[in-house]
Amino acid sequence: MTVSFPSTLHLHPILDVLLSQIPESCHSEVRLGLQEALVNAAKHGNNLDPSKSIYIRFRPIFRGYCWIISDQGQGFRPDREGADRNAYCYNGKEPSSLEDHERDCGRGLYILYHIFDQVEWSDDGKELMLYKRTSRWIFPSLFWNS
C-alpha cells in the first residue's frame, strides 16, 4: 500500500489507514511511533510546506510490518557522524532526568528507537524505514489466491 499527502499535522485519518492492516494489539504503540515519524517528516523535513508531500509505503514482511516514509526536505541522518542512537537522543541521558526545554530535541527519535525493532535512514536522509516485529508469521496477500 502507498499513501501520500501534503505536509500537515492533521494525521488522524492517515494513521487510521496505516494501522488498518496490523493487529489491534499493536495499534497504540505503532500509532505513537508513526505519528512521531510523520510529524518529523512534515515539520522538519518539509517545513510544513503544503506544496511538498509525504509518501508512505507499507508492507507486511516476514514476522512483522515495514513502513517507508519519504519527504521532500534536505535529508536527515542522526548517525552520519557515527553517533550512538541513544547518545543522539537526549545526549545519553534518561528522558525523565532532562529539563523541560531539553525534552523536545530528540524526543521523536527516542520514541522511534524504542517502539520499532529497526529504524534506518536512506543515504540521502529523505527516507525513513521502520520495521516492527510481531509474534506471528505474516503472509502478504499477493501469495494467496483470491
Regions found by a protein language model. Give the residues of each.
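Bergerat-fold GHKL ATPase/HATPase_c domain
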Residues: 1-32, 141-146
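Conserved beta-strand-loop-beta-strand hairpin that lines the nucleotide-binding pocket
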Residues: 1, 42-146
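Conserved ATP-binding N-box helix of the HATPase_c
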Residues: 25-52
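Generic detector of short, locally flexible boundary/turn motifs and exposed helical patches
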Residues: 19-24, 31-36, 84-86, 92-97
